[in-house]
Amino acid sequence: MEDVKLEFPSLPQCKEDAEEWTYPMRREMQEILPGLFLGPYSSAMKSKLPVLQKHGITHIICIRQNIEANFIKPNFQQLFRYLVLDIADNPVENIIRFFPMTKEFIDGSLQMGGKVLVHGNAGISRSAAFVIAYIMETFGMKYRDAFAYVQERRFCINPNAGFVHQLQEYEAIYLAKLTIQMMSPLQIERSLSVHSGTTGSLKRTHEEEDDFGTMQVATAQNG
């Protein structure tokens, strides 16, 4: 594939007056990026409507599994726009397939001047993984750097091992996707041609090796 230089925006730096983390803060939401918040379901309950409105929340991503639907609910569908994802906090759950739609949802909100809250149940594993993935793709970051950035703002995050593995894999996936999006049709065609030519060369090499091996066997038999 031809070299395509990807450019990413600068990552906002941590506020100098950032509040020191205390245990009770895990039950509240924190602003990870300007306009992007991460928290537990308790930060999106009916009793927290004044807090949500105070922070200017307009969009909410609610992450839950089916058995949690009885108590984790989109409580303000008349006031906020919701994206509800049915995802279990299970290491074998495929979360990569949901990353594109969540990025589109968050980008759409921020571009129109809105603010987004991403929450699961505890705001530690599932929702944290999605915020990390968003930061990775938006700012061109590796998993470990995006994790550290989010943890500076919400110290209690701890995506399960399966989610961590998928986030580490996602780096190559989003870079390849963005590279293809940046390439012109001619560049893509050239890259495919180069790849095809390389494959053909390898095939010819293997065929030549097979022919040479056959000749050696025939010579040995005749000798």
UniProtKB/Swiss-Prot annotation:
GO cellular component, one term: cytoplasm
Alphabetic keyword roster: Cytoplasm, Nucleus, Phosphoprotein
Gene Ontology molecular-function annotations: F-box domain binding; pseudophosphatase activity
Ranges of residues in domain Tyrosine-protein phosphatase: 28-176
Chain location of the short sequence motif Interaction with FBXW7 per the record: 76-78
Compartments where located: Nucleus; Cytoplasm, Cytosol
PROSITE patterns linked: TYR_PHOSPHATASE_2 (PS50056), TYR_PHOSPHATASE_DUAL (PS50054)
Presence of keyword Cytoplasm: yes
Start and end residues of each stretch annotated as Disordered: 197-223
Predominant location: nucleus
Gene3D superfamilies in the cross-refs: Protein tyrosine phosphatase superfamily (3.90.190.10)
Family designation: Belongs to the protein-tyrosine phosphatase family. Non-receptor class subfamily.
Known role: Catalytically inactive phosphatase. Acts as a nuclear anchor for MAPK1/MAPK3 (ERK1/ERK2). Modulates cell-fate decisions and cell migration by spatiotemporal regulation of MAPK1/MAPK3 (ERK1/ERK2). By binding to the F-box of FBXW7, prevents the assembly of FBXW7 into the SCF E3 ubiquitin-protein ligase complex, and thereby inhibits degradation of its substrates. Plays a role in spermatogenesis.
Subunit structure: Interacts with MAPK1; independently of MAPK1 phosphorylation status. Interacts with CARHSP1/Crhsp-24. Interacts (via FQQ motif) with FBXW7 isoforms 1 (via F-box domain) and 3 (via F-box domain); the interaction is direct and prevents FBXW7 interaction with SKP1, a component of the SCF(FBXW7) complex. Does not interact with FBXW7 isoform 2.
Protein name: Serine/threonine/tyrosine-interacting protein
Species the sequence originates in: Homo sapiens
Name of the gene: STYX
